[in-house]
């Protein structure tokens, strides 16, 4: 089964920069995400059914403090499935956060999980089929937005079945 570990990002849909982005992309057909903003720390393409990953997650997450990330860039990329993803990211990622993610990913692989995609820090804001508009056009629209750098502390982590129930959740200490 497919599973993923995500850390929630408390974004506001009505933030001025997000309104500006949506206005600048009107009439494109972009489907905007209206909530449940998160960073996928690990997407597991195949999770062994006989392995309980909760102890592995607890080993790392019980002692890890909530990271504060400064978001300062909007951009877009194209997925293997042919969707353009409009996203928010941080150009400087704390090393402790990257190390945590790499350690968890490594231990999950050692436990028999198949993880095909590398980590890419992004918060999905919207999606559109690549056949509708060129990536360069979407990227040009994101560059026109006045995005002030802002910092958020990320506390809530969920491990879930892809498009399914939550297996494990924790609130990181602040």
Predicted regions mapped to residue ranges:
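Basic, often amphipathic N-terminal segments
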Residues: 1-71, 93-147, 166-174
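Extracellular/lumenal ectodomain signal focusing on beta-strand-rich modules
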Residues: 71-73, 156
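Glycine-rich beta-strand-turn "strand-cap" elements at beta-sheet edges
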Residues: 79, 154-166
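Internal active-site segments that recognize and position negatively charged phosphoryl groups
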Residues: 151
